[in-house]
Amino acid sequence: MRGKFNNIVETVGDTPIVRINQLAPGHVTMWAKIEAFNPLGSVKDRLAMGIIEAAEQSGELKPGQTVIEATSGNTGIGLAMVCAAKGYPFVSVMVETFSVERRKLMRFLGAKVILTPKEAKGMGMVAKARELAEANGWFMARQFENPANADVHERTTAREIMDAFEGERLDYFVSGYGTGGTITGVARVLRAERPDTKIVTTEPDGAALLSDGRAQERNADGSASGSHPAWAPHMIQGWTPDFIPLVAQESIDKGYIDEVIPVSADVSFATAQALAQKEGIFCGISCGATFAAALNVAERAPEGSVILCTLPDTGERYLSTPLFADIEAEMTAEEWAMAASTPTAVLARPS
């Protein structure tokens, strides 16, 4: 996206779709929609814009009112950006186990960050955010139930995909899910306008809630009333809370999803690194997981198939996580040898 804009929020969306050249099997064509090109580096910038602007239009959000949300980080970062641009104080409630980069980014944007114990899981952070909202008269974004979440993807992400592939094949669309906004919003349009496109989602292999088949118990307002019995802690940050969000439930109930592919954390880490080192695409853990699922589809797809996947964020907010566990900060033995192979500016090697 290029040009002049009245504020940073106007730059959300219109992200590039990039061909995969080195990692794609030879019999198919693979594309990736790189959501790191959003202003704060993730697909959740769309959600943040959509929810806040819908609440402004409905009158539910008043000028200067504090916004609060339970988030694994990317939604919080997006909301911190949108709220800063529009003049709303923002409070994020986040489980203590998510990366410290997320906390610092939100605080740098002026947000307050409340941490909840890991034992309380995602349900605990949601309950805490709801409690604080009710006690203080704050607006809660409710990303897991808010229809504006999927609506913004139907209005933006899906239309961008349709425009990019107008008159061309698009055999498979692959996306992970956190809230379900991307998969549901895009699927609405694909089912209506490209019904032959197969829609594939993916989830952690140790927390395969959709694959499990058991229903999510819900409160009267559609929010989850408890943790799903198939959930277990996993390392793919931003994916699959301990419940099936209402926004994702639409994709289940309406039969949008053709296949669910479980992916392990180890495969996710390795695939994210492969995207960086083979394609130059720097992205996070859930991107590695999504692309691993897309590769699974590609390997089984008929000759000539065209596969599009979403890569939801950037890798920089994972520096403190296991994604970077094998990446050295100091020079390796090979690098020391290279440095010493010519005489100029040789660093003294520690003893």
Model-based region annotation:
Residues M1-S351:
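PLP-dependent amino-acid enzyme catalytic core
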